[in-house]
A protein has these predicted regions:
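RNase H-like polynucleotidyl transferase catalytic core
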Residues: 124-129, 198-216, 232-234
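C-terminal domain-tail junction helix/linker
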Residues: 109, 239-281
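Basic, flexible linker segments flanking DNA-binding modules
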Residues: 1-12, 55-90, 109-119
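A short, amphipathic alpha-helix used for macromolecular contacts
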Residues: 2-50, 90-91
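Acidic/histidine-rich, metal-coordinating catalytic segments
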Residues: 175-187
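Extended, low-complexity cationic-aromatic segments
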Residues: 80-166, 269-277
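Active-site proximal helix-loop segment of RNase H-like, two-metal nucleases, encompassing DDE(D)
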Residues: 148, 217-239, 250-252
Length: 281
């Protein structure tokens, strides 16, 4: 004798219902900001594995959180259109440079040598370090080639910024330059504006307020941070500066341009999205 085939235990609650509850903030009695699979399972009277399976099927991840900032620049549309236009259709016979500074780079020296990576083991370093001062890296990224003009300076006042602009101008003599910059105060000092007025071949294009992400040199700053600074050990600011310059030299030997893909309309549509949250937050 044998049992007839059976369908198994009937489904108590479907995945769509689980997800719909997940998208609503937990009741105040729980004192939490978002659901965990165990808490939601207990709340619905089902297993946490069932909750986790529903989340996986629908791509729901309550534990994740991203930050955003509502654009407030009254010139948002014009600035985004201007900068993105330079990236997607740069002017002929001109150079477009993304300019900014990476300030307060710390010269940190580990108290013991780093242990190298081995099969099955990542590189290791001590948590303890000694501080030996800071440096500021000024950089100008050529969007057509990816090459970088850089300079390390002890401070990041308008004096240092203006000196760097003059260095950039010397690096591109007799060329029309379009500089993409953010709204940092030193970039708008009267001394800087006067110098730009006296050099009409150099034009500035400002990113929107809180829109530094539009500046492609920020991508390059992330690269140098990951590849040369974060895991480095620097016994002095002089050593830090030397290694930054070495990275720039190596980068320029193997560089490539960054390709901008989104249009201004796509960016503005996303920036102007209305809030659709239905939670009580």
């Amino acid at each position: 004798m044998a049992d007839d085939p059976r369908s198994g235990r009937p489904v108590m609650i479907d995945h769509q219902r689980i997800v719909s509850v997940t998208l609503v903030a937990p009741p105040k009695k729980y004192g939490v900001t978002h659901w965990s699979s165990r808490l939601l399972g207990r709340h619905l009277g089902i297993s946490n594995t069932t909750v986790a399976r529903a989340w996986r099927d629908y791509g729901v991840q309550p534990w994740r959180l991203e930050t955003s900032k509502v654009p407030t620049d009254p010139e948002l549309v014009g600035k985004v259109t201007d900068v993105v236009g330079l990236y997607l259709a740069p002017p002929e016979n001109a150079v477009v440079l993304c300019v900014d500074e990476k300030s307060q780079i710390q010269a940190l020296d580990r108290t013991a040598p780093m242990l190298p990576m081995q099969p099955g083991l990542p590189a290791r370093r001590t948590h303890d370090y000694e501080r030996h001062g800071t440096s500021t890296l000024f950089a100008a990224l050529d969007i057509a080639t990816g090459t970088v003009t850089g300079a390390c300076k002890p401070r990041h006042r308008h004096q240092e910024f203006l000196a760097f602009l003059k260095q950039v101008a010397r690096a591109y003599p007799d060329r029309e330059l379009h500089l993409v910059m953010d709204n940092y105060a030193t970039h708008k000092r009267v001394e800087v504006r006067d110098w730009l007025t006296a050099n009409p071949r150099i034009r500035v294009h400002f990113t929107p307020t809180s829109g530094s992400w539009l500046n492609l040199v920020e991508v390059w700053f992330g690269i140098i941070e990951r590849q040369a600074i974060h895991r480095g050990s620097f016994p002095s600011v002089k050593d830090l500066n030397a290694k930054i310059r070495a990275f720039i030299t190596g980068w320029n030997d193997r560089c490539h341009p960054f390709v901008w893909t989104k249009t201004a309309d796509q960016i503005l549509k996303k920036a102007n999205r209305k809030t659709t949250s239905t939670t009580r937050h």
